[in-house]
C-alpha cells in the first residue's frame, strides 16, 4: 500500500478470545486465528499501528472498536496504552456505542451484560488538535472570530449488527459505520478496514459515497464480503 494513501480506518480487530466461553452462546468466527498470548497479541496489534502510520495521511483518523471480554478484561487498556507509548498515534476521543441488545446472556454470577462498547478515535500525535472532521460551524462571534460548532457528542446509538447470518458473530452494523463517517470522513474519502470480516465497513462506505479498501484472512468471510459488496454495487447502478 502506498504511503499517505488513506484518509482513515474504521475497524474492529480480533479480541483474542479463542476459548470456550461459558457466558455466551457463540464463538467469534476466528477460533483458529484468535488465540495469541497476551504479549504476542499486544505486539501484533502495535506493529499494525506502526504500519498505519505510513499509509494513513497525517490528518487521518482511525476509529478502533475494541471491547473487553471476561477472559482478560484489561487487554484493551493495555493495548491502547502500548499504542500510545510506542507509536505516533494517540487518543483524540473515546466514543461510547450504545447497542439495542446486551450480550452476553445473564449466566454469569458476577459479570454485567454489555450494552455498550468503546470506539477509540486515534490520530497522529502531531495532529491532535488539527485532524480532519466533518464538524459544521453553527455561528461565528463577530467580535472575536470564535467559531461555534453544531453539537456532536461521544455517544452513538446504533444496531448491534446487520442481522446477516453466518459464523462470524462479532460484527458491527452499517448504521454504526454511517454515523462514524458522518463525523470524520467527507464524501470521496478512502477508508480501510484491515479486519474486513463480512464487509460491513465497505457497505457503509458505499452507502455514504466513500471509497474503500479491505483485508480479510478467512476465505469464508472474504467470499461473503465480496458477495454483499457486489450485490450492493449492483443496486446502485
Indicate residue ranges for each PLM-predicted region.
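Short, conserved SAM-binding/catalytic segment
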Residues: 226-237
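Core catalytic lobe of class I
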Residues: 1-224
Amino acid at each position: 500500500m502506498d504511503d499517505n494513501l488513506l484518509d482513515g480506518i474504521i475497524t474492529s480487530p480480533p479480541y483474542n478470545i479463542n476459548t470456550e466461553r461459558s457466558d455466551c452462546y457463540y464463538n467469534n468466527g476466528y477460533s483458529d486465528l484468535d488465540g495469541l498470548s497476551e504479549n504476542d497479541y499486544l505486539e501484533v496489534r502495535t506493529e499494525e499501528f506502526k504500519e498505519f502510520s505510513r499509509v494513513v495521511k497525517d490528518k487521518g483518523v482511525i476509529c478502533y472498536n475494541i471491547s473487553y471480554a471476561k477472559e482478560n478484561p484489561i487487554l484493551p487498556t493495555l493495548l491502547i496504552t502500548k499504542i500510545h507509548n510506542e507509536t505516533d498515534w494517540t487518543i483524540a476521543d473515546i466514543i461510547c456505542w450504545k447497542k439495542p441488545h446486551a450480550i452476553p446472556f445473564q449466566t454469569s454470577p458476577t459479570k454485567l451484560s454489555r450494552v455498550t462498547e468503546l470506539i477509540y478515535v486515534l490520530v497522529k500525535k502531531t495532529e491532535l488538535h488539527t485532524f480532519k472532521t466533518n464538524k459544521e460551524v453553527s455561528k461565528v462571534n463577530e467580535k472575536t472570530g470564535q467559531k461555534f460548532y453544531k453539537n456532536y457528542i461521544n455517544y452513538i446509538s446504533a444496531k448491534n449488527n446487520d442481522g446477516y447470518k453466518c459464523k462470524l458473530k462479532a460484527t458491527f452494523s452499517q448504521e454504526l459505520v454511517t454515523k462514524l463517517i458522518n463525523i470524520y470522513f467527507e464524501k470521496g474519502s478512502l477508508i480501510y478496514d484491515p479486519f474486513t470480516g463480512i464487509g460491513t465497513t465497505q457497505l457503509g462506505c458505499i452507502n455514504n459515497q466513500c471509497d474503500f479498501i479491505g483485508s480479510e484472512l478467512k476465505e469464508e468471510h472474504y467470499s461473503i464480503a465480496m458477495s454483499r459488496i457486489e450485490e450492493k454495487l449492483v443496486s446502485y447502478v
